[in-house]
Amino acid sequence: MEEECRVLSIQSHVVRGYVGNRAATFPLQVLGFEVDAVNSVQFSNHTGYSHWKGQVLNSDELQELYDGLKLNHVNQYDYVLTGYTRDKSFLAMVVDIVQELKQQNPRLVYVCDPVMGDQRNGEGAMYVPDDLLPVYREKVVPVADIITPNQFEAELLTGRKIHSQEEALEVMDMLHSMGPDTVVITSSNLLSPRGSDYLMALGSQRTRAPDGSVVTQRIRMEMHKVDAVFVGTGDLFAAMLLAWTHKHPNNLKVACEKTVSAMHHVLQRTIKCAKAKSGEGVKPSPAQLELRMVQSKKDIESPEIVVQATVL
């Protein structure tokens, strides 16, 4: 019998579309993982639409759900995955749950996308309350094993600006020293060696050699920019990175190539379908730009490698 690998995913849920748990659960299941989803919010759709309705889970309600799992002795996990959170007390409760689960299973891996903000027109802007930053910096990152910040979030966490690849590598080393063994800066403003049509991502993984010494693998990836605003891509990225680092535990290069290549296929299919629906010269709507997840099942399962990572 194949060994079961179980993920506790604490993220947002939408009725229509693919963000948060909706973007993470399907790919993880396709790749063979059991996923237990806690929905931090339940909205009709993501907030990029003109309207949305729904409910938000508070920290007491999160505790209640977790207590239910505990009472039935079904709170054994191999992974915890978290993404967008707006509430400080909710985030602190997540940390408490992760710490308790790690006491039960010291090999548990916590994958955290520290969603706080992004760069718009060259200026960084936070889209969560400012009081979340110290919680991420002091409580979340120290218990995380894999983190997937964008450049702006990596700068916030370390207090260091990134203007070059060298500075990005230094920032990743600072993040390693805060706790996580694997750091992937999922997008940056750095100029790619391949030109301005490409988006650059960087990764760094620390592993222990049999003699106890620490080995660091650093990689760079360049992805062709797509002229559209997608929502849920970070959630999909973190979920697939979880899956592929599990399957290739000491090879960040291969794990990232598979993750980014699958992303490429999903986004290309999405933009093609969106343009076909919107018509020539018309900007696709948020509904038309929802990720074509189900249609991309084969690409998620066994992605054709179209993005090669460079080992630095």
Swiss-Prot record:
Pathway the protein takes part in: Cofactor metabolism; pyridoxal 5'-phosphate salvage; pyridoxal 5'-phosphate from pyridoxal: step 1/1; Cofactor metabolism; pyridoxal 5'-phosphate salvage; pyridoxine 5'-phosphate from pyridoxine: step 1/1; Cofactor metabolism; pyridoxal 5'-phosphate salvage; pyridoxamine 5'-phosphate from pyridoxamine: step 1/1
Description of how activity is regulated: Activated by K(+). Activity is increased in the presence of Na(+).
Cofactor: Zn(2+); Mg(2+)
Enzyme class: transferase
UniProt-annotated location(s): Cytoplasm, Cytosol
UniProt GO BP: pyridoxal 5'-phosphate salvage
Any Pfam family: Phos_pyr_kin
Positions that bind pyridoxamine: 12, 47, 235
Positions carrying Phosphoserine: 59, 164, 213, 285
Active site positions: 235
Chain positions recorded as pyridoxal 5'-phosphate binding sites: 12, 47, 127, 232-235
Organism, as annotated: Ovis aries (Sheep)
PANTHER family found in the cross-reference section: PYRIDOXAL KINASE (PTHR10534:SF2)
Catalytic activity: pyridoxal + ATP = pyridoxal 5'-phosphate + ADP + H(+); pyridoxamine + ATP = pyridoxamine 5'-phosphate + ADP + H(+); pyridoxine + ATP = pyridoxine 5'-phosphate + ADP + H(+)
Residues the entry annotates as binding K(+): 113, 148, 186
Protein name: Pyridoxal kinase
Annotated residues for binding of ATP: 150, 186-187, 223-226, 233-234
Residues with N-acetylmethionine modification: 1
Subunit structure: Homodimer.
